[in-house]
Amino acid sequence: VRIRIIKFLSGIFIAIIFLFGVGILVLPYLVSTDMIRIRLAQELSAWTGYNVQLRDPPRLNLFPYPKALLSGVTLASRMDGVAPLMEAESIEVDLSVVDLFRGRVSFSETRIVHPQFVMEKPVKTMADFFDRFSRSQGALGLAIREAREILQHNPENPEIDHLLKQPFGRVVIENGALVYQDSFSGVAEKITGLNATFDWPESTEEVRLRADARWRGEFTKLSIDASQALLLLAGGKSQIKASLNSVRGGITFTGQARLSEYYIFDGKVSMRSPGWNQTLSWVAGKQFWGHKFKIPIVWESHFLARPMHIQMNNVTFTMGKTNARGALELDFQDHVPNVIGSLAFDNLDFSFFRPVFFSVKEKNPFFQTEIFNHIGVDIRLSAPQAKLSNITLTNLAVAIQIRNGHCIFDLGHANILGGSLQSNIEITPAGQKLWLEGRASGTAIDMQIVLEVLGITPFLQSRANFTMILRTLANSWSGIFAKMRGELALSMSSGRLLGYDLNDLQRRLAKNEQFFLMNDNTLSTAFERWNIQTSFSDGTTKITESLMRTEDWSLSMWGTIASAIMQDWQDKLTLQAKLQKNNSSETLCRDVQCLANSLMQPLTFSLNSKGQNRGNFWVKQDDDAN
């Protein structure tokens, strides 16, 4: 019995092999290559609405699985004089074995080898891109138009289940190219090495696209998943996840989208850039502002985009080693983007922004004002700690406004140089020059730190309150100081003058008409109050009043300095001075000390630093001194 069973099964197995072999042999005779050619042409034409041209008859391969190979395939517009949408070296289609035995042709997967796609006109918007499909006379265009009719009746809860479920399957593109026109420059560009897999089982189901190519010199990956692709193409809403990545940067959006004239993107966006300059040069060349900004950026936020308006909440981003949180809005007025919002940094280094606002021309960096006419800004910045060159700031609160070519930088508060500072600076382009007007005030500023920051050996220990007003019109940084006009008032309640002793100065003035006054680190003078009033104009500084009061003396100085830059004052100082005793009177004294002090005549003299080392002066009494 066992032997009979084995013989029976062996016979069945041999029969199956025989029938399979016979089927393979007769299969090419059952399937007409013309049938494959016609069916493929019908399918492509029905879906795209384009005419399909096949240069050669298809070839049928049965091993390792049935497939048809067509060479020289062209998708051409039905309008004369329009470039073909696609020209492919070959198209391979996987065939269903069951349908082949029935004498029918059905495709499970289509591979397009070495195609070149041509988009003759620039696509201005995503809606414009998909609108081209909806206008086609193929099955895809018909399905999109039917979905649009459903959306018109019930835009919030469209029911597309009853639509005819058009099979689409899988399309694979191998080593293709795409030629298109850049929407900004109008120049034709080419994407090469295009490999893509497009999965869309049926028109009412989810779409999955995976693609990679070389775009603008970089290997780039694109990924798109849409849960309701047909609704999306028809202008409805769909859940979508899309990402674009390369070594130059990447962006991912996850959320709900509607691609129409009144588009909407509502979800989460994540962006990374190894260097903002690298990302901009890759995406848009050097035609956008900020292309010199080299800091790496990582960004995440909720993202809501509508026509002419973008809102980003719950912003968290990293810029170099700086982290920030906040909210931003972007809208457009007369095609000019306007950014509004606030950002809170954990620390901020203003040197990051130097390449953005400053250009270098013949080793003379200056402010770039072109951006003022191309963007509007109203942003509040805050940071518990910030850095400006080698100056540290804490509790920073800043407002920046740019509108109609006019920039306002408002420093609401900052702890700086041991005290606090407020300032307001307005910048307005004037042809090739820059009009700058500013006001600043400070409280309890440590003058010793100020001098150290300026690179000057400290000759003063005190805290000062100050107010400053300045105005200038210039086309370079050196021109700002050369043409600057304004006033500066300093008020110090107490402190110490380092390197000099007024008692020693009085004794030397009493004995000599002229002498050399040197800075001596062992000497100092404590003062009770020191008020200074200065003005500057056309590269010169005028000290209108400088009154220092010590316990015993009052020292007044005035004069003009041929420089508006404090670091250059050393060899340009020529000041007049008067030294006199305190508690004196020219009329009536009420005590003996006042009487004694009044009998001492004030000493008037000049201080000249020309040709001297820093801190040294040539002192000469006035000829008419009493």
PLM region descriptions:
Residues V1-I14, A305, I310, V315-M319, ...:
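Extended terminal
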Residues K237-A242, H309-T316, S382-P384, H406-G412, ...:
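Transmembrane beta-strand segments that form the barrel wall of outer-membrane beta-barrel proteins
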Residues S136-F265, F366-I402:
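Elongated, acidic membrane-bridging lipid-handling scaffolds
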Residues Y50-N51, G72-F198, A284, L330-D334, ...:
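Secondary-structure transition motifs
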Residues S45-G72:
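Short extracytoplasmic
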Residues V1-G49:
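N-terminal type II signal-anchor transmembrane helix
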Residues Y50-N51, M79-L95, F184-T197, R216-D225, ...:
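Amphipathic hydrophobic-ligand
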